[in-house]
Amino acid sequence: MSGEEEVDYTTLPLEERLTYKLWKARLEAYKELNQLFRNSVGDISRDDNIQIYWRDPTLFAQYITDSNVVAQEQAIVALNSLIDAFASSSLKNAHNITLISTWTPLLVEKGLTSSRATTKTQSMSCILSLCGLDTSITQSVELVIPFFEKKLPKLIAAAANCVYELMAAFGLTNVNVQTFLPELLKHVPQLAGHGDRNVRSQTMNLIVEIYKVTGNNSDLLEEILFKKLKPIQVKDLHKLFAKVGDEPSSSKMLFEWEKRELEKKRSQEEEARKRKSILSNDEGEYQIDKDGDTLMGMETDMPPSKQQSGVQIDTFSMLPEETILDKLPKDFQERITSSKWKDRVEALEEFWDSVLSQTKKLKSTSQNYSNLLGIYGHIIQKDANIQAVALAAQSVELICDKLKTPGFSKDYVSLVFTPLLDRTKEKKPSVIEAIRKALLTICKYYDPLASSGRNEDMLKDILEHMKHKTPQIRMECTQLFNASMKEEKDGYSTLQRYLKDEVVPIVIQIVNDTQPAIRTIGFESFAILIKIFGMNTFVKTLEHLDNLKRKKIEETVKTLPNFSIASGSTHSTIETNKQTGPMENKFLLKKSSVLPSKRVASSPLRNDNKSKVNPIGSVASASKPSMVAANNKSRVLLTSKSLATPKNVVANSTDKNEKLIEEYKYRLQKLQNDEMIWTKERQSLLEKMNNTENYKIEMIKENEMLREQLKEAQSKLNEKNIQLRSKEIDVNKLSDRVLSLENELRNMEIELDRNKKRNDTNLQSMGTISSYSIPSSTVSSNYGVKSLSSALPFKEEEDVRRKEDVNYERRSSESIGDLPHRVNSLNIRPYRKNGTGVSSVSDDLDIDFNDSFASEESYKRAAAVTSTLKARIEKMKAKSRREGTTRT
């Protein structure tokens, strides 16, 4: 064995053993660290040897990724002990964020995927403890989500299980669900369709946990997730949801900041309990809150509010915005205004089927729907085709519901609300149902009875149509009015202002209508008013109705639920008075004044001369100490609001003071309402200004971008024009060249024809001369191509022939431009030699033209030259065409 292997690693210091090459040495070092952390829980702030592992997360980042699985397991156990030791004293700061971002991904990748059960359990415990140092699970989940894109199924399943455990342990406390859930659910369909069964199983568990922590909100999952899953998976999820029940998920763990707040709250409550227990004779029997109210057996150590109910999520705000104005069908404007009803209906159906029905949320910013809603309003009000009216009403309802407020502005309401009221005259069920839904949807977002009074114009339109001459319109508008009163949750101050002069007279007309169906709706309307304002308000009005109608109204009143303003308790009446106008205050004060008077009159000690009223309002007698003790005991059972001094109330209960108080309350309430209205208007104006400025900036940027694009397009166009001109010049040159070549060819052909004719003429003339003896001066040695002098001597004639042959050979290699000259220079010289080898003139004169050998040879030679010329001309043409094609 070598010297290095014989070293006893147990003698090495801890720092060296933590990085020693033998895994057993590292294992023992990790165990020693774990024991050190456990023994130093109460004194970790003073021990620098422990602080270094907390301050430098890279140390344990190396330990928990140990190559040996046994040593790695012990390193993760030591890390868990380290986190437990520092968790209680660790405050929320950037260092905690560094620890989480450094250790969590390593624990997921190396710990949760381990084959050892203890390693996986301890890794999950470390991840949860690290998340407890944060304020929410957002960062931890964001660190785990990238593992969903990995290829290893074991790692993907571990990541899905990690997110599930985080949500089950901490819930959605301090989580911005509007951004958190869409980012998480974006990866779920891919995981649900994974090829590995374990991944799919963990994904289903994660979906069920999301359902639980969102307060059993299945609508959220249906809108965002279910359409991306397989039908069988959706069916299985519904079965799992049914097993969960109606109880929302409760968190198992608390963040460290929650633990500190809960401990602080408990200590404060304990101090308050000790400080205020002296108010009771039986010390410690009752608990009193900070307002002095008695706590009747309430638990002070209640869990956080997050464990009491699920998170309320606005599903609509999480949906992606879509645009529809850029998806209008082709020629929509022309087709929708066509005189043919089929064209109008087809345009509406095409837009509804392809765009509107598929839309989940409409974009409101930088989109103007006035033109589209104006078209729908015109169709609803004027179109004779009820199918087009129904489609337009459905479209209006969907646009209103997908824009909501403030996207569906009051300007849009004015375009469609009155046309819808006018068209309630339709009796076909499908049409009138579409109109009803559209009206109810608009009133859902713009309540005609809102206490702010901004929608009083809508209330006036409804009341005006309740007096319409058409019975169907009266009935439908009365039903809409009843629905608005039933759904009102903001008080009835607006209805109170219109009650005496407009609402009651119109309702009386409806009650006295000639048609039974309309009267029944009128009875319901009157009954709702009685439920809201009380029977005493309408005593005189009911006297003008016959007994049968009064009976019908009373029966209807019994079937209706109670409304907030009609509540009989003094507390609810006082709370309602804070939100109502002066007329409501008078009415409610008159009703609520009965209760105190009865309590005073029913007291058995009222007529006792020895009795007296104590400052807290309870009646006591000096001769009955037991009664005094009972009253002293009952003091703590009264709330602080009931401890007002009745002497002041009785002394200031004159009619004059009541009127002044009511007047002051009315003025104060009016000023408060005006202030609220002005504040809202100011905010809306500021928002509009900001939106206008933003829109202006966007338009300026877009304008600059378009200008740059225009400049680029112009420069490209100029370049293309220059290239086009150059191409045109090249084409013109090539065309001219082709024309010149064609002319040359044509001239050559003409010259060849001439030469041929000349040869034929010479042959004929020589045939005539053959029978005669011709003088040498008149004999031509050329057969039609070129004439020679008859007086040439033999030597000169031979020299001329030699020169002409040389010239012919030289010219045969010249360019095609010399073709006419070369054709003219062609010579045919047939001659015969005598015995001495010299041709004489007499021999030429004695030519036997019956022997056609010489003429045939000359003709063949001319034909060969002609064919050669034609072949060269064709090659020249082909070459010119190729050059023209290449240039183009």
From Swiss-Prot:
Disulfide linkage: none
UniProt remark on domains: The coiled coil domain mediates homodimerization.
Known InterPro entries for this protein? ARM-like, ARM-type_fold, HEAT_type_2, Stu2_CTS, TOG, XMAP215, XMAP215_CLASP_TOG
The family note in this entry says: Belongs to the TOG/XMAP215 family.
Question: What stretch or stretches form a coiled coil here?
Answer: 654-762
Q: What is this protein called?
A: Protein STU2
Q: Which GO terms describe its cellular component?
A: cell cortex; kinetochore; spindle microtubule; spindle pole; spindle pole body
Biased region (Low complexity) positions are 765-780
UniProt region (Disordered), positions on chain: 756-780
Sequence positions bearing Phosphoserine: S2, S277, S813
HEAT repeats (start-end):
51-88, 175-216, 411-448, 453-490, 503-541
User: What happens upon changing R116A?
Assistant: Decreases interaction with tubulin heterodimer
What subcellular compartments does it reside in? Cytoplasm, Cytoskeleton, Microtubule organizing center, Spindle pole body; Cytoplasm, Cytoskeleton, Spindle; Chromosome, Centromere, Kinetochore
Q: What is noted besides the main data?
A: Mutations in STU2 suppress a cold-sensitive mutation in TUB2.
- Locate the region TOG 1: 8-280, 326-550
Tell me any Pfam family this protein matches. Answer: XMAP215_CLASP_TOG
Which gene underlies this protein?
A: STU2
GO BP terms in the entry: establishment or maintenance of microtubule cytoskeleton polarity; microtubule nucleation; microtubule polymerization; mitotic sister chromatid biorientation; mitotic spindle organization; repair of mitotic kinetochore microtubule attachment defect
Q: Name one GO molecular function term.
A: microtubule binding
SUPFAM superfamilies assigned to the protein according to its UniProt record, in alphabetical order:
ARM repeat
**Role of this protein:** Binds to the plus end of microtubules and regulates microtubule dynamics and microtubule organization. May play a role in the attachment, organization, and/or dynamics of microtubule ends at the spindle pole body. Stabilizes both cytoplasmic and nuclear microtubules. Promotes mitotic spindle elongation in anaphase. Has microtubule polymerase activity by accelerating microtubule growth and inhibiting catastrophe.
Name the UniProt key words of this record, in alphabetical order. Answer: Centromere, Chromosome, Coiled coil, Cytoplasm, Cytoskeleton, Kinetochore, Microtubule, Phosphoprotein, Repeat
Q: How does it assemble?
A: Binds to microtubules. Homodimer; each monomer can bind via its TOG domains to two alpha/beta-tubulin heterodimers. Interacts with SPC72. Associates with the NDC80 complex.
Q: Does the keyword Glycosyltransferase apply?
A: no
| Highest rank taxon of the organism | Eukaryota
